[in-house]
Amino acid sequence: MGGNLGVFVRATFLTVVITVVGSAAAGELAATASKRIPICHGYSCNYRTMLALGPADGARFRAILRAGAGSPQAERSAISKAVRYFEQRTFRAIGVRDLPQSEFGASRIRGQMDCVDESTNTHALLVYLAERKLLRFHKVERNASRGLFVDGRYPHWTAVISDRGGTEWVVDTWYAPMGGAPDIFPLSQWKKRGVLESGALN
């Protein structure tokens, strides 16, 4: 009986070890697996260019997010760096550098992005990071909007994340030039902005 018990204990131990190692290996595989992401451009996703993120990209994102694993604030800083790298890869895929904000009359111009394109692409990146379990302190939320013209604000969209405390944060890439740092601050503050002042968007 004692011998059988010993065999059972060893078998159980090996099962646990294999499960843990297997889960870790699966996590590593997911983090480096290739992914094709459709990149919107031309305003309101008039065009879509496929961006292939391979193992090298996965390793780069993993290193970036690992550096922000210490706190929610550090992770948001890492997300900013991940967005900048993602936009550099986007530029290489499309071959055209997007200008900051949106120029009226630039609709259907390949490579130029309005806030719909920007928020859609950023959301896709955040989902990519979440799928690979690279976000420890935040989860991806639905994109948010503000502005209705009648309230003196031009309609504007942004990607959104939330922290464990429930605070929602925008990841708004529209204002910066392509590859620049996105605006990351509370959604509640973002909702109040965007009033037309001196002919410019705030």
Language-model segments: which ranges?
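Bacterial N-terminal signal peptides
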Residues: 11-22
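Low-complexity, Gly/Ser/Thr/Pro-rich intrinsically disordered linker/tail segments
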Residues: 191-202
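Second-shell loop/turn segments in exported
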Residues: 47-49, 64-76, 104-117
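Boundary at the C-terminal end of the N-terminal hydrophobic targeting segment
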Residues: 24-33
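N-terminal, post-signal-peptide region of Sec/Tat-exported proteins
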Residues: 55-90
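Hydrophobic/aromatic-rich core segments of domains that either
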Residues: 127-190
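Mid-length scaffold segments of soluble, non-membrane domains
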Residues: 81-138
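Bacterial N-terminal signal peptides that target proteins for export
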Residues: 1-13
